[in-house]
């Protein structure tokens, strides 16, 4: 495996785990709106959503870190990465980009309007949704990870 691909994968995975663990808990200026997030979900729900969202990514990242010195990662680990980040890519399409670009989802649009009110956005609103900058960056990390997985 090319070292740059391995380090790129480890770096992107680490960023995504940090994002999943912290983005609903740590103030990030105009990149987040913690008051709106806490107003739409209870602390208990937020805790469990954070844990359950981060767990698969944290586990596969941890195993990749254990194998970081290996010349080539085991096939089972590569498969695990594909399942994890393939699901993440499908999830971003279903939750964000499909409703933004292709189909209307009024309930989702209203939820996003409340949760991400006042956050930084640079894309125009479509179908009632304007993806916030922080999630766009996260989605780019997911896409980057999938691209690097094709180079394993």
Task: Identify the residue ranges that each predicted region occupies.
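C-terminal halves and exits of single transmembrane alpha-helices
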Residues: 82-103
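Hydrophobic transmembrane helix segments
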Residues: 15-51
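Cytosolic juxtamembrane helix and N-cap/initiation of the first transmembrane helix
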Residues: 1-17, 133, 144, 148-151
């Amino acid at each position: 495996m090319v070292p740059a691909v391995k380090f790129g994968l480890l770096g992107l995975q680490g960023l995504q785990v940090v994002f999943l663990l912290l983005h609903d808990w740590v103030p990030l200026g105009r990149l987040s709106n913690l008051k709106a997030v806490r107003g739409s979900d209870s602390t208990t729900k937020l805790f469990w959503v954070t844990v359950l969202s981060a767990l698969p990514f944290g586990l596969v990242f941890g195993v990749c870190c254990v194998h970081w010195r290996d010349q080539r990662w085991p096939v089972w680990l590569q498969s695990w990465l594909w399942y994890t980040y393939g699901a993440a890519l499908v999830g971003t399409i279903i939750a964000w980009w499909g409703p933004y670009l292709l189909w209307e989802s009024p309930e989702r649009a209203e939820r996003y309007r409340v949760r991400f009110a006042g956050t930084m956005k640079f894309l125009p609103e479509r179908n009632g949704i304007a993806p916030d900058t922080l999630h766009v960056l996260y989605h780019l990390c997911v896409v980057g990870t999938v691209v690097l997985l094709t180079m394993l």
